[in-house]
Amino acid sequence: MSKGLFDCSGKVTLVTGGNGGIGLGFAMGVAKMGGDVAIWARNADKNAAARAQLEAAGAGRVMTYQVDVASEEQILAGYDRLMADFGRIDCVFANSGASPSYNSVFDMPTEKWHEFLDVALHGAFITLREGARHMVARAEAGEPGGSLVACGSLSLFQGLPGKQDYAASKAGIAAVIRCMAVEFGKHRIRANVVAPGLIITPMMGNEQTAKYIADTYGPRTPIGRVGYPEDFDGIGA
């Protein structure tokens, strides 16, 4: 494939939650443009399957690591291993998260609120912060540039009953990204949020459930369909 302006060869991209769904969509975009990809996710079998797909798509190098981003200790150790293997980091996609589980705020136990934010907000923040730390060090050594990307949601703009944990994490990380864009712009490090709508991923449930969702809600969108992970190829690159 002709890469042109989107040539990712020689660049190293980290995708958290990159072994499936939207995260794998981001990673595939980088792989198709020849970039190196690091995946952080907890499931070793899914990591291995994702690695095979990314290598087949044309990635330069692919490494997967079992990292739980709810743990700052694991994030820091993950970066140590990534830097030992690749020697640099050029792009971070903070994508790890989960689907919301409740239909009313009164059904949401307080501990589940904290558990959700530990991954989708606190984990994303620490992942982006530590990735930026490496990028800034590289910039100060004479090689500026980098990209920080958070996976947001249309819940940034529209309220949803019972989805306070999900929406709060997305709004919080969007605010973090805006601050990072201002702080790190002088190093030519970009910071952006991608805000998907309804995307059919394995978290939606079985094939029958996914088809019901696609058939019910797809016609209500301007393009007449829901989204799929492969729609994120171009965004990833």
Name the predicted role of every residue range.
Residues R133, V182-K186:
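Alpha-helical segment proximal to the catalytic Tyr-Lys
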Residues N19-G21:
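Conserved glycine-rich cofactor-binding loop
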